[in-house]
Amino acid sequence: MARTGAEYIEALKTRPPNLWYKGEKVEDPTTHPVFRGIVRTMAALYDLQHDPRYREVLTYEEEGKRHGMSFLIPKTKEDLKRRGQAYKLWADQNLGMMGRSPDYLNAVVMAYAASADYFGEFAENVRNYYRYLRDQDLATTHALTNPQVNRARPPSGQPDPYIPVGVVKQTEKGIVVRGARMTATFPLADEVLIFPSTLLQAGSEKYALAFALPTSTPGLHFVCREALVGGDSPFDHPLSSRVEEMDCLVIFDDVLVPWERVFILGNVELCNNAYAATGALNHMAHQVVALKTAKTEAFLGVAALMAEGIGADVYGHVQEKIAEIIVYLEAMRAFWTRAEEEAKENAYGLLVPDRGALDGARNLYPRLYPRIREILEQIGASGLITLPSEKDFKGPLGPFLEKFLQGAALEAKERVALFRLAWDMTLSGFGARQELYERFFFGDPVRMYQTLYNVYNKEPYKERIRAFLKESLKVFEEVQA
């Protein structure tokens, strides 16, 4: 059933993840200064499911119980649109800056479950895990990337065969795994999902695996990077105080994975095709397009308010820059709409959003985002670094700040609050991390384009040109005759 924020927080207190920060075990992330902000933010998302204003958007009813909308297995385009509306509502709460809200990976697990026959002997495990996640409404994280030890060599060619996560042995109770994965974003989750990573070569069977575990599992460790939380003040740090999700290295120190939590084992082909064959790639990208749309809307809103606030909106070059963001926003909306309107069933009967539209969005946005960020910096200019704190306004020089930092259409404190938001979106550590995240969210941009080149059906367009040239040659020969 749809969870509440209090239930999420209580689960973190009762079964905290094995979280390490600056060499120390984090015993209670709900009160830790680095993590308490994102914990409150996640709890607020769960509570939104119970708000009478949003209940019908964020949840659906099945067998007398209400579940999060991201668990709905779509049968119609209307179902897809309902899922998209729920994605967008959650994304709007944090200006599209939260990449690991639960709906992101719920979309993957839902697609896996709806296409469970793909997983052969582990099909029932996948179905059961979906029902478990849905009924408990758990938060999940995942880790896809192998440690960057030697990127020129496959997993089996690393200095230690257990640098990437691999199977050590099989027992009556399950499989024992050892190794590590990088970039587990949002470790304040109930569960961690280890799904297929990069394409595996033949002979890499011990790395061909997919499974899920509670984040509190013995032998499982999340080692955090340095925090980007600037402080507790939502005035000074409007984003990092609330949406610092944290990124981690995940270590598996001979961890037992029970058989009922194993989804793929030793099958390289299944691993390599899992996302595409099940529709998980499309459904994950559907959530992402809604998220990026919300993010682009936020940049547009901030840019427009900044320009108006300091009287810069009268200049043509400023209008041009803001219009550029509008163009990008409308492109994302078009990708999103087409993905839903041209959805088709996959081989397992799951309605899947159109991949062509989604591939367009997920290849374009990593190139758009740095430009969107740059536009905000160009509009804000020196105003983005002349930003006193909340305490300065309350201090003895407050009256001076009210005079010198006012805007054409804003009081001083309003103007500084707006520009501090723009600073947190662009120039702060949080803002810089957001750009890196967007550049590589779906992987190496060059490989992404190569994949698009290889999977996209170019034949109809090639044939049109052949026919055109053939007709042109025919006309030329007739004229010559």
Curated annotation (Swiss-Prot):
Positions with a binding annotation for substrate: 100-104, 142, 197-198
Alphabetized Gene3D superfamilies for the sequence: 4-hydroxybutyryl-coa dehydratase, domain 1, Butyryl-CoA Dehydrogenase, subunit A, domain 2, Butyryl-CoA Dehydrogenase, subunit A, domain 3
Species assigned in the record: Thermus thermophilus (strain ATCC 27634 / DSM 579 / HB8)
Name of the protein: 4-hydroxyphenylacetate 3-monooxygenase oxygenase component
InterPro entries: Acyl-CoA_Oxase/DH_mid-dom_sf, AcylCo_DH-like_C, AcylCoA_DH/oxidase_NM_dom_sf, HpaB/PvcC/4-BUDH, HpaB/PvcC/4-BUDH_C, HpaB/PvcC/4-BUDH_N, HpaB_Deino-type
Catalytic activity: 4-hydroxyphenylacetate + FADH2 + O2 = 3,4-dihydroxyphenylacetate + FAD + H2O + H(+)
EC category: oxidoreductase
Entry's Gene Ontology BP terms: phenylacetate catabolic process
E.C. no: 1.14.14.9
Molecular function as annotated in GO: 4-hydroxyphenylacetate 3-monooxygenase activity; flavin adenine dinucleotide binding; oxidoreductase activity, acting on the CH-CH group of donors
Keywords of the record: Aromatic hydrocarbons catabolism, FAD, Flavoprotein, Monooxygenase, Oxidoreductase
Subunit structure, interactors included: Homotetramer consisting of a dimer of dimers. 4-HPA 3-monooxygenase consists of a reductase component HpaC and an oxygenase component HpaB.
NCBIfam families named among the record's database cross-references: HpaB-1 (TIGR02309)
Keyword Oxidoreductase: yes
